[in-house]
């Protein structure tokens, strides 16, 4: 099969599907219309599919094959964001937007599925197509990854479009691969502080949760600065601080939420433990009650080295000038990691930002946009890899 030629035949459909999905975003696990659209397309392609997992569509090419089983994954959910791109196919749904590229991921997997289905007689093996919900919640892959169905898979592949690599000198249209640790954990923590409220003019009568919160916020940065090697990438960030309702009242409580990003189980455990110890120690110092919780969301994305090398070889057959190896991990997280905890695989990137008003906007921004010119590269690489591995 001439993979690039076959993919180019479906490129117009790829863009059409992506635009339809972009106009009609859905959130989390509530993807009824998206799932219906995907399932109908798979039916058109003659691909067996089911919706037995919450918010997901699973398809199979050559389901009866006893050969090697490769899973291809695309996520489908959007974000609770009001779109401000001004694109002709902008979101039609108030307060919802595909601001992280999942519309493209879904369309790209459909394109790969269509081509592979048309050439299924040339394939000695089975292909599992995972159209996944709720990546943005960090939990959409768990049910599938833990299933008996997924346990039969030998390898799993996925990709992310967009501008996650902005600022690294990566050219548009680049296909970026990483061996080993590739993306960080996406953990969350909460800290609740209970002090004693008082009038703002009488701080001596208070146990001030705002002051205590400030000590906690600054002190936990010592975990990164003084307890972990500077060669080990670690992030501790606060995203929510809630306390008080009046300018002249010291409140009784404060609430903090944040995220940690790590790349190894050992550092993950250390950060989780020390966050709690520091918060509770500061609370004790200032006579406040502390409630601390740490939520382990997606683990690190750790690519299989051999599979990544084979994916790079496949990509170089099609786009020899566009393949780049990433030498440092990205501290963003991805629930694709739950698949990689179960089976070997690889997660790669397409760098395809589109400027709005002359600027490239970050993922999750209301003006985030992607260039469609390069979107065909992802299904092309997936199909080439499958044919290299399973082609007769």
Model-assigned labels for residue ranges:
Residues 1-98, 107-124:
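Acidic/His- and Gly-rich active-site-bordering loop/insert found
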Residues 20-24, 98, 102-105, 160, ...:
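Histidine-centered active-site/metal-ligand motif
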Residues 21, 59, 72, 102, ...:
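Divalent metal-coordination and catalytic microenvironments
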Residues 44, 214-392:
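Metal-dependent amide/peptide-bond hydrolase catalytic core
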Residues 71-73, 189-191, 347-352:
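Non-cysteine beta-strand/loop elements that form the S-adenosyl-L-methionine
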Residues 79, 87-97, 104, 121-240, ...:
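Histidine/acidic-residue-rich, glycine-tolerant segments that coordinate divalent metal ions
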């Amino acid at each position: 099969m001439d993979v690039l030629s076959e993919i180019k035949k479906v490129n117009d459909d790829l863009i059409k599907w992506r635009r339809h999905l972009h106009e009609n975003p859905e959130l989390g696990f509530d993807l009824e219309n998206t799932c219906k659209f995907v399932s109908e397309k798979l039916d058109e392609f003659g691909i067996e599919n089911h919706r037995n997992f919450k918010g997901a569509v699973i398809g199979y090419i050559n389901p009866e094959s006893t050969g090697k089983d490769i899973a291809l994954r695309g996520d489908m959910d959007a974000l609770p964001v009001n779109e401000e791109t001004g694109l002709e196919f902008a979101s039609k749904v108030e307060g919802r937007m595909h601001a992280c590229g999942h519309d493209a991921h879904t369309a790209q997997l459909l394109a790969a599925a269509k081509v592979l289905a048309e050439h299924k007689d040339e394939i000695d093996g089975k292909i599992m197509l995972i159209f996944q919900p709720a990546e943005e919640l960090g939990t959409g892959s768990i049910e599938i990854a833990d299933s008996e169905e997924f346990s039969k898979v030998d390898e799993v592949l996925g990709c992310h479009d967009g501008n996650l690599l902005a600022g690294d000198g990566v050219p548009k249209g680049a296909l970026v691969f990483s061996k080993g640790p590739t993306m960080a954990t996406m953990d969350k923590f909460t800290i609740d502080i209970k002090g004693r409220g008082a009038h703002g003019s009488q701080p001596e009568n208070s146990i001030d949760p705002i002051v205590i919160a400030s000590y906690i916020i600054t002190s936990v940065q010592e975990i990164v600065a003084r307890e972990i090697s500077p060669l080990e990438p670690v992030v501790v960030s606060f995203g929510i601080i809630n306390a008080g309702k009046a300018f002249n009242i010291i409140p009784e409580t404060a609430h903090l939420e944040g995220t940690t990003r790590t790349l190894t189980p050992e550092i993950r455990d250390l950060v989780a433990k020390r966050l709690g110890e520091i918060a509770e120690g500061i609370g004790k110092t200032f006579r406040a009650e502390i409630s601390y919780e740490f939520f382990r969301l997606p683990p690190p994305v750790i690519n299989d080295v051999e599979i990544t090398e084979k994916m790079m070889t496949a990509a170089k057959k099609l786009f020899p000038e566009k393949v780049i190896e990433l030498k440092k991990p990205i501290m963003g997280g991805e629930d694709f990691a739950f698949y990689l905890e179960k089976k070997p695989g690889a997660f790669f990137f397409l760098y395809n930002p589109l400027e709005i008003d002359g600027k490239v906007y970050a993922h999750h921004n209301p003006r985030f946009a992607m260039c469609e010119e390069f979107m065909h590269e992802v299904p092309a690489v997936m199909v080439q890899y499958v044919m290299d591995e399973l082609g007769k």
